[in-house]
Amino acid sequence: MILTALLAVGCGVLVGFTLGLIGGGGSILATPLLLYVVGMQNPHLAIGTGAVAVSANAFMNLSGHARAGNVRWPTAAIFTAAGVGGAYAGSTLGKAFDGQHLLILFALLMILFGVLMLRPRREGSHAPAVLTPRYVLRTAGTGLGVGMLSGFFGIGGGFLIVPGLIFATGMPMIYAIGTSLFAVGMFGLTTAANYAMSGLVDWIVAAEYIAGGVLGGLLGMRAAIYLSGRKQTLTRVFAGIIFIVAAYMLWRSLGHG
């Protein structure tokens, strides 16, 4: 029990650290770490537990970005309102999906995420958003699609939400990161509630994960300040880690190890 608790806290620190250092992508490590380091045997239990931790850590990180003025609340509301319904539908489908097949798809999504991380990102407009019908429809449509993927895989989806917001609205990266945290928290909360209703959340491990995430997030944000000039290098290193973890998940899920 003590070893499991230490592993859960340690993994929470790692996820929180990567969230604080490079943004929303760190949440994608939550489920693999619960499965292969903490030692959870049930993929669905790992997804539900990870969703609780990701949601809590996202809301805690949101407060700092909100104080800095990095959250565009009207856009966050439109994106999240559409995405919550998608997250519920996606998580309902995910619970009914075979656990091992779900992990294979999860690993493939991780590879896609790694590729997206390596792509250069354009800087958007700093002007306040004008809520035209086209803007609202595009934002809501993107939110619905990202919410479904987030719920299906039990992840906060920050790595999908950030490029999704930039694609839909053209906002700068810093605003996309801040705005995404509200959606990450709400999508994760929706997924966690759906899994919890089926008894697929280990609340003790979730609490340990959250505690580690708080510490890791603080360390990650401090590291990001000191290493801001090397952020592209750090992103590439993290993408490499994602590829390695995805390859390991595929290897395990296909009957090896």
Residue ranges and their predicted role:
Residues 43-47, 177, 181:
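Small-residue hotspots at the loop-to-helix junctions and early N-terminal turns
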Residues 50-54, 180-184, 205-210:
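Short hydrophobic/aromatic, small-residue-rich stretches within specific transmembrane helices
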